[in-house]
Amino acid sequence: KLGCTRVEIGAQTIYDDVFDLVKRGHHTDATIHASQLLKDAAFKISYHMMPNLPGSNVERDIAMFKELFDNSAYRPDMIKVYPCMVVPFSELKLWYEQGRHRPYTDEELLEIIFRIKPNFPRYLRVTRLIRDIPATSIIGGSKVSNLRQVAQRMMHEKGIVCQCIRCREIREQPIDV
C-alpha cells in the first residue's frame, strides 16, 4: 500500500558470542526470524554487516560472509559492509585504549574483501563497502573513504573477479558498438 519493497536489517554479525560481548540485545535467531518474515511477505532484504566487531577476527569474519550465502536462513538480496571503527564517546574507545580491541589494518580489511567478494552470489547487490565517517572522527580503524574503489582496482590487478550485481553493471564496462 505504501510502496515499500525493501527492509534493511542491522544484522552486524551471525555470532551470538559477539552479540553478547557488544551488548546488542538479541541473537542471530532474531535476524533469522525477521528475515523469514520479510521473505514470506516478498520484501527484498538488505543486511548491514560489521566485520571487526570485538570477539571476531579476520578468519571468523570471512567465514561469516560465507555462511550468509551458504545458509538459506540468511541470504540477503543486498548488503552494506561497515567495518567496525573506534569513534569518540563510545565504550569501544575505552576498550581500544585498554588494549581490549584492535581495529583491522587496511591490509586486513582488503584481505577480507579479496576473499569474500569472489564468492558473492550473482543476485547480490553490495550497496556500501565502508561507512562514510569523517576521518577526523575515527580514532581506530580504516580512514580510507574509497575502500571499495581501492579494492576493485587491486582485485582487477590481481585478476580477482566478483560476480555481484554492482561489479557486473554495464556503466563501468567498455562498450564495443
Locate each region found by the language model.
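C-terminal accessory regions of radical SAM enzymes
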Residues: R100-V177
